[in-house]
């Protein structure tokens, strides 16, 4: 397992990054319900809709990332290895201000914690609390949603006042 980056090493590593993730596409059975989930729970905004020969869908954004919600009309456009009836992506992570608040919002729309995955990761057992706590939930069409107050290594900390301090090998040994 790689050691956490110090802030200086992080800055140096990020200066070499030439591309940034700006788009994630989800294949969904119900475009409207899936879009409504991300709008209602995470505050994303709808920025476009389309109905083309191979797919229909909408685009959502948080101001930094484009999230396409797609419903494919044929296997060729969806990709033959998956086909038009395959839905999902493994998981999408959201940095939030409060795990308790987002838990209430997720519960209100019928989303439940993935206790199996959370247990396997040790969430709630103390040792994960020392760094990042990622709590997994199930979203529309079984899409796994990951929520965290501290964000992930290698990403900007948009919620700096909520973020835990960066832990280096030196501070862990102190």
Give each language-model segment a name:
Residues 15-16, 26-73:
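Core segments of cupin and vicinal oxygen chelate
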Residues 28-44, 91, 113, 134, ...:
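Secondary-structure boundary/capping motif
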Residues 75-79, 153-156:
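A short local loop/turn or secondary-structure capping micro-motif enriched for an aromatic residue
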Residues 78-82, 122-124:
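Short, P/G- and charge-enriched loop/turn segments at secondary-structure junctions
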Residues 46-51, 93-95, 122-128:
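Short linear motifs in intrinsically disordered
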Residues 72-74, 118-119:
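Generic short beta-strand segments
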Residues 2-5, 11-17, 20-30, 58-61, 80-174:
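Vicinal oxygen chelate
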């Amino acid at each position: 397992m790689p050691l956490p980056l110090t802030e200086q090493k992080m800055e140096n590593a990020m200066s070499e990054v030439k591309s940034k993730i700006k788009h994630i596409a989800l294949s969904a059975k119900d475009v409207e319900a899936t879009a409504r989930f991300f709008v209602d729970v995470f505050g994303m905004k709808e920025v476009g809709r389309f109905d083309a020969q191979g797919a229909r869908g909408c685009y959502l954004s948080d101001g930094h990332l484009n999230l396409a919600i797609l419903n494919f009309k044929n296997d060729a456009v969806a990709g033959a290895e998956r086909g038009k009836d395959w839905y999902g992506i493994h998981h999408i992570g959201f940095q939030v201000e409060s795990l308790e608040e987002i838990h209430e919002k997720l519960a209100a729309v019928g989303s439940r914690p993935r206790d199996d995955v959370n247990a396997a990761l040790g969430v709630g057992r103390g040792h994960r609390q020392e760094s990042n706590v990622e709590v997994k939930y199930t979203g529309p069409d079984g899409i796994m949603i990951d929520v965290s107050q501290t964000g992930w290594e290698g990403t900007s900390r948009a919620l700096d006042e909520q973020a835990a301090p960066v832990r280096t090998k030196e501070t862990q040994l102190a």
